[in-house]
From Swiss-Prot:
NAD(+) binds at R12, I13, D34, R79, N315. It comes from the Eukaryota. SMART domains: Gp_dh_N (SM00846). Its EC number is 1.2.1.12. D-glyceraldehyde 3-phosphate binds at S150, C151, T152, T181, T210, G211, R233. This is Glyceraldehyde-3-phosphate dehydrogenase. GO terms for cellular component: cytosol. One of its GO terms (biological process) is glucose metabolic process. Keywords: Cytoplasm, Glycolysis, NAD, Oxidoreductase. The record marks H178 as: Activates thiol group during catalysis. Belongs to the glyceraldehyde-3-phosphate dehydrogenase family.
């Protein structure tokens, strides 16, 4: 039986989570909340997407929500999460995708309306973070609010795990070459303390900070303090790429490392970690459901202990699929208790 899900925040991730849910056999979205748009506009935004194309299905608007592929989706417009009547539509698991309620205290407000559990689709300062294929098995059901970490952590962590398990990472640096996002500016404008972040997204390569590499230490405790990184925001609308440069304890040729990653991609991490030897570019990865796609031809090694590894990720589509996979995993674990 499908898990009944509510989505709070119908922005980029909220809508892409919805699109992925339509394809996910274990998930049924029964309610959406967004105080800034009405159902008619929500239907339009769900149907048409500049990066992912026209919705493959039927969307209709009715009196109090949407009908998607014949199924009713209740639409709410509450600003306060505690006021959203999730129970009325049967939504038990909530995807918190506003980018605003990212702490346990703020996200717990959803429980007031009848939700059982909240999954934050962003990093959290205090909620337990889980990355599918890395540490989801440590979930014990005690926390009401959990985080799916960031799209970049979801790309980096599975690859780092494979390398660390086989060769032991001594230390490493990561750079994510990241497509621009909604928080950036279309033209130069004020941006608080991040002056570079206020420059036009489509005109510049913008150095930026990211906590994605450090967050790997939270999901792989053995790597805590051994990885850090930065971001380069670039003028592409979707798909990003991680450059992970590491020093490894157990020496290996690049071909040996490729074989290790390929084995994991075809085995224990199938559907999470991809592997390709094709001459791909970023747009080829648009719509890819993996968290991370290892580019075997793009990496290089200096010697047997120092290597640069490259992995692509659709920072919208792949990440949103993992949000739902984590949700389905958690719901199944909760039901077995």
């Amino acid at each position: 039986m499908a898990v009944k899900v509510g989505i709070n925040g119908f922005g980029r991730i909220g809508r892409i989570v919805f699109r992925n849910a339509v394809e996910h056999p274990e998930i049924e979205v029964v309610a959406v909340n967004d105080p800034f748009i009405d159902p008619e506009y929500a239907a339009y935004m769900l149907k048409y997407d500049s990066s992912h194309g026209v919705f493959k299905g039927e969307i209709k608007k009715d009196a109090d929500g949407l009908i998607v592929n014949g199924k009713k989706v209740k639409f709410h417009t509450e600003r306060d999460p505690s006021a959203i009547p999730w129970k009325a539509s049967g939504a038990e698991y909530i995807v918190e995708s506003t980018g605003v309620f990212t702490t346990t205290e703020k996200a717990k407000a959803h429980l007031t309306g009848g939700a059982k559990k909240v999954i934050i689709s962003a990093p959290s300062a205090d909620a337990p973070m889980y990355v599918m294929g890395v540490n989801e098995k440590t979930y014990d059901g005690k926390a009401d609010v959990i985080s799916n970490a960031s799209c970049t952590t979801n790309c980096l962590a599975p690859l780092a795990k494979v390398i660390h398990d086989k060769y032991t990472i001594v230390e490493g640096l990561m750079t994510t070459v990241h497509s621009y996002t909604a928080t950036q500016k279309t033209v130069d404008g004020p941006s608080g303390k991040d002056w570079r972040g206020g420059r036009g997204a489509a005109q510049n390569i913008i150095p930026s900070s990211t906590g994605a590499a450090k967050a790997v230490g939270k999901v792989i405790p053995d790597l805590n303090g051994k990885l850090t990184g930065m971001s380069m925001r670039v003028p592409t609308p979707n798909v990003s790429v991680v450059d992970l440069t590491v020093r490894i304890e157990k020496g290996a040729t690049y071909d040996e490392i490729k074989a290790t990653v390929k084995e994991a991609a075809n085995g224990s991490l199938a559907g999470i970690l991809g592997y390709t030897e094709d001459d791909i570019v970023s747009s080829d990865m648009n719509g890819n459901t993996n968290s991370s796609i290892f580019d075997a031809k793009a990496g290089i090694s200096l010697n047997k202990n120092f290597v640069k590894l490259i992995a692509w990720y659709d920072n919208e589509w792949g990440y949103s699929r993992r949000v739902l996979d984590l949700l389905a995993y958690v719901a199944k674990a909760d039901a077995s208790k």
